[in-house]
Amino acid sequence: MAKELTLSIIKPDAVAKSVIGEIYTRFEKAGLDIVAAKMIQLSREQAESFYDIHRARPFFKDLVDFMISGPVMIQVLKGDNAVAKNREIMGATNPKEAAPGTIRADFADSIDANAVHGSDSLENAAREIAFFFEPHELCNR
């Protein structure tokens, strides 16, 4: 089976709680290798561009404001069925609906401050990875 790549963002709420290491451990235990990573402070322009697909949605401004409220940890994950596997370990968008033991059930506070972002398809993963990383920044593992 070919290995997939997916993008993961540890959002400002989880970065502020100092749970990056715990989340990384979950990725690795699920068979997802971290092949690129960086911590950045998103600008408003970056956040608006990244979440442009949601621009017409009523939550867009709040989402952008939240994503620029503190640093984020961005990583590219590689593994079998990486997109689906990452979404499974993240849990439901609303942490109140997330299965016990998922990242959002354990570390998220609300549907807005929900700890992590993960690509929802291979197509979006490719677009999102290219938004934050140059090809030479991805390491073979």
Swiss-Prot record:
Query: What is the recorded name of this protein?
Result: Nucleoside diphosphate kinase
Q: Which GO terms describe its molecular function?
A: ATP binding; metal ion binding; nucleoside diphosphate kinase activity
Gene label: ndk
- Identify the InterPro entries for this entry: NDK-like_dom, NDK-like_dom_sf, Nucleoside_diP_kinase, Nucleoside_diP_kinase_AS
Q: Name one GO cellular component term.
A: cytoplasm
Cofactors, names only: Mg(2+)
Disulfide bridge map: none
According to its UniProt record, the EC number is: 2.7.4.6
What Pfam families does this protein map onto?
A: NDK
